[in-house]
């Protein structure tokens, strides 16, 4: 497992009985996590000091219980030096905060790969969410095309770019259905040296298009292969779906990309270290093809 263990403004303090206790800057949040199936005793005294707790509803969704007044949003930083990003945190109605902290281990990998390339790199970030990967790539010098189906989420990404001092970088922010966008890019003859995709398990595009990961992921990977440049640098696929193992994702990349480009593939879980126990909570998986 590859842990995201370089954070200073984020910390997974403890995890048990279906919940995480997290520190986001100076704010303590409790959020549900279906991966946390163990019911060990709470190891941190800070559970009782949580500033807000998210409660799931039996009807789906849920709501926040605020135990003290919190700002609507606040900022945290990730990375150091030229890789430092400033990201806006805001608790949403679906338990999320605008940042998936485990992805920081991938952001650092993308940035390192781009800096070492020694040539101009164009990156396509599909299902780009609030832009952590986009900004990591842009800070490393890449030209980035960021695509997400949610107008509000793309606006959040632009705000993160401004907060990180990257608003003037070569980033295209697009609200679009990812599969339809890739098909249009193929017709236009546009290509990319790096592709990142972080698809949801289930979702709908801006035109009501239905996305189900297991049904759609192979076709999308195959489409994306056709918009890679003649000398691509990397292709990364992230998944939070327990039914889609890292090895399955790697197999799709291996059989789709290696016959044309050579290179190598790898896969692993990513996770967050738990301060109270020294363990690591799994938070999804990443499969990578690289030159």
Predicted features, each with a name:
Residues 8-22, 29-101, 108:
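Non-catalytic substrate-recognition/targeting regions of SAM-dependent transferases
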Residues 101-119:
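Conserved alpha-helix/loop element of class I SAM-dependent methyltransferases that forms part
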Residues 118-129:
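Conserved class I S-adenosyl-L-methionine
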Residues 128, 148-152, 216:
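Short beta->alpha hinge that forms the Motif I/post-I loop of the SAM-binding pocket
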Residues 130-144:
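Conserved SAM-binding loop of SAM-dependent methyltransferases across substrates and taxa
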Residues 215-230:
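A short glycine-rich, Lys/Arg-flanked "PGG" loop and its adjoining helix->strand segment in the class I
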Residues 232-291:
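C-terminal catalytic and target-recognition region of SAM-dependent MTase-like enzymes
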